[in-house]
């Protein structure tokens, strides 16, 4: 099994090109099922989860071709409506096939999902919303079995809690429903906006995009389109934090500053000079050690949970004491014991991590426990004396495209080893 070997070096410096957003690409790939003509997606990152999504679509009978960052989907021959356990167990986003299959074909059997081990992430919001639209659903033998006679019906859905995945599933289902669907307390994440914009390009009628109330007037058919996936804001944030921790200066190209305002504000609080353009972000620490910051995760536009682990590392090496409070997922501090093995001074109190900054960490063999935690360990290794060996990096490969190559391009000593 591959590992990453990391050695400390100087400050990161240079330019990194940001990949397309995994969390936008996955739902948009599933939306290809809704199209009655070929659908072309560009700026798609080369990731394990993307490959799994393509396998799932092929398993249903769709024709999928991958050419670099371009994926073409022809769903006209879909004749199979089961998303099997073998594929779904490795990727939570597989649940997003449920809405499109049910809306277009009236039937879907989807295995209960797997993916990152960071808490329950219940699917009941997805199921309850689809039931309000007329679906008959039972969970049996590890599968969600959903059926509808004719088309789904428009409904007024109030979501008990903000859920990105449930918003996306219901948005896709409503696009082909009969009548008007209103989703209240909808997620406002940029990736939800990207999916909605893609659906509009396919012929969907959606208003309120980017707000907490989405109104979808169902249409009888959706067509394929050419669509470019938004830049990955979490990858962007990860490289910016790595540069801040190493007291460096970097430029992120193919980035979207408007999707990262809460993160950029915290980096400025930490002492970084930030400059932005339409599609680039520059960070310069001027050789200074970052200052500790206080973080509280919450749904967009507040601070993203997917950047929490990276800021834990920033605080580990910062001047002063900072607190990180996690409000989205339980069990999302699994990186803390690994960082403590490297010499971090941290303590957990419920959903809050109190971090006292130290000058340097010590290299150690550590284990990645989930996608973003593994990125935090790589950043820690860049400021640790000796060698850091990160095990279980298949988590990293699920969400970061060629991460070691990109770090090497910035001067980081990060090497993949067997």
UniProtKB/Swiss-Prot annotation:
Modified sites of kind 2-(S-cysteinyl)pyruvic acid O-phosphothioketal: 116
Q: Which GO terms describe its cellular component?
A: cytoplasm
| This protein's pathway | Cell wall biogenesis; peptidoglycan biosynthesis
Q: Which SUPFAM superfamilies match?
A: EPT/RTPC-like (SSF55205)
Q: Enumerate the InterPro entries for this protein.
A: Enolpyruvate_Tfrase_dom (IPR001986), Enolpyruvate_Tfrase_sf (IPR036968), MurA_subfamily (IPR050068), RNA3'P_cycl/enolpyr_Trfase_a/b (IPR013792), UDP_GlcNAc_COvinyl_MurA (IPR005750)
**Residue positions binding phosphoenolpyruvate:** 22-23
According to its UniProt record, the EC number is 2.5.1.7
Q: What class of enzyme is it?
A: transferase
Q: Can you tell me which residues form the catalytic site?
A: 116 (proton donor)
Q: Which reaction does it catalyse?
A: phosphoenolpyruvate + UDP-N-acetyl-alpha-D-glucosamine = UDP-N-acetyl-3-O-(1-carboxyvinyl)-alpha-D-glucosamine + phosphate
Q: What GO annotations for molecular function exist for this entry?
A: UDP-N-acetylglucosamine 1-carboxyvinyltransferase activity
Report the subcellular localization. Answer: Cytoplasm
Q: Which domain of life is it from?
A: Bacteria
One of the protein's GO biological processes: cell division
Principal subcellular localization = cytoplasm
Q: Where does UDP-N-acetyl-alpha-D-glucosamine bind?
A: 92, 306, 328
Keyword annotations:
Cell cycle, Cell division, Cell shape, Cell wall biogenesis/degradation, Cytoplasm, Peptidoglycan synthesis, Pyruvate, Transferase
Q: Which HAMAP family match?
A: MurA (MF_00111)
- What is the recorded function of this protein according to its Swiss-Prot or TrEMBL entry? Cell wall formation. Adds enolpyruvyl to UDP-N-acetylglucosamine.
- Assigned protein family: Belongs to the EPSP synthase family. MurA subfamily.
UniProt-recorded name of the protein: UDP-N-acetylglucosamine 1-carboxyvinyltransferase
Give the species.
Answer: Shewanella amazonensis (strain ATCC BAA-1098 / SB2B)
